[in-house]
Amino acid sequence: MNSFPWLTIIVVFPILTGSLIFLLPHRGNKVMKWYTLCICILELLLTTYTFCYHFQLDDPLTQLTENYKWIHFFDFYWRLGIDGLSIGPILLTGFITTLATLAAWPVTRDAQLFHFLMLAMYSGQIGSFSSRDLLLFFLMWEFELIPVYLLLSMWGGKKRLYSATKFILYTAGGSIFLLIGVLGIGLYGSNEPTLNFETLANQSYPVALEVIFYVGFLIAFAVKLPIIPFHTWLPDTHGEAHYSTCMLLAGILLKMGAYGLVRINMELLPHAHCLFSPGLIIVGAIQIIYAASTSPGQLNLKKRIAYSSISHMGFIIIGIGSLSDTGLNGAILQIISHGFIGAALFFLAGTSYDRIRLLYLDEMGGMAIPLPKLFTMLSILSMASLALPGLSGFVAELLVFFGIITSQKYLLMPKILIAFLMAIGMILTPIYSLSMLRQMFYGYKLFNVPNYYFFDSGPRELFVSISLLLPIIGIGIYPDFVLSLSVEKVEAIISHFFFSIVFKKKE
């Protein structure tokens, strides 16, 4: 066990310091915003320092472990630790939350509560990624939903209450299945509950029972990821939420579902995952084409970007179902890549709304001349979304593509068919991305504003946009920068997966 509680400090620091926001002067919006931004920067620096000096990339085992008895009656532990699978999402969480705080600078109504909720969400997300106890994972998963619901219901469009209610109904429904799975696995075959990830990874279950557990976890993670048909909350939520909240949803929240699918379904329930992986690949391929086909019909700019996110999540599902090193590495890279791309697209959509007060594409047009900086940034990021070579999306999708082709589990013809469907999805992506750019920036000026003059992106907005763009370019040019974090862990997961399958067959 680690002698110094680095991870505990990283998890509790945002919410503890964030609670002091309410002690600041009520009208001191600027002081409070700088205070929140400083907390996020300090947290990101602390996380980076801890991982740089106390984490070994070539070690696939859990590191920086902390294990404290919490509730004696239930034998419940505060158990934290990180490995190659969780380090990337934790760093992504810190980076996106810091920029989302800067993006939320224009928020003035109930600003104290808004920024506190962002910091509470920050703690919940890092806690979910670093939990090594199944019940602690569930508690962090649920805790994170509270600030998200409040952010959705209090700040946003006219239908924000409807979208927030829809979000909480979907996620709470999924959480019921998550809790059943957690209790079922923890209480199975033992007088005392066993909730330690390391212990559960070596636990064996009857196939029928393992399938039941798997389905419960799959439903919970399918809502968050989202996987069709559990996706309908996402376009409504993104369409109404404030764009800084959208950055957190697209950049981090969706990735929690993918993380849980690998961490729990694949690592703890390998035999059921082997049975369900062909279905995951089929659903992933359908999702890519379905969302890419639906996106062009969305006139709401943020809803169109939301459907593009659903399409990109299909590649993550296929990578997880490919049962290959290459495919799983591609899925993890897509988690990080889309975190940057999705957050950047929603940020730029929000900044354009701040200027023209329009969200529907059929009301826009001719914005390239008055807003050249916004036009340039959104064009580059749309290219990243459609997986232009040299940008991060291309490498991630290519790895998933090769992962399914080289997988040893599937026959040749099904692999060719899935690859063909993925290729169709890749062809459909430029249609909705480029048509979005055409409707926004080219053609006639459809917004009739007398003596119009719009301010282009300012220094703050350019800083946020460029900060999100640089990692996208960096990963596209040198993907090993991210892959080196997870490659050893992915190899260990795949090796343990196939060892468990072979061992089960021998029994």
Swiss-Prot record:
It is found in: Plastid, Chloroplast thylakoid membrane. It is a multi-pass membrane protein. The gene is ndhD. InterPro entries: NADH_Q_OxRdtase_chain4, NADH_Q_OxRdtase_chainM/4, NADH_UbQ_OxRdtase, ND/Mrp_TM. It catalyses: a plastoquinone + NADH + (n+1) H(+)(in) = a plastoquinol + NAD(+) + n H(+)(out); a plastoquinone + NADPH + (n+1) H(+)(in) = a plastoquinol + NADP(+) + n H(+)(out). It comes from Oenothera elata subsp. hookeri. Its main location: plastid. Keywords: Chloroplast, Membrane, NAD, NADP, Plastid, Plastoquinone, Quinone, Thylakoid, Translocase, Transmembrane, Transmembrane helix. This is NAD(P)H-quinone oxidoreductase chain 4, chloroplastic. The keyword Plastid applies. Pfam families: Proton_antipo_M. NCBIfam families: NDH_I_M.
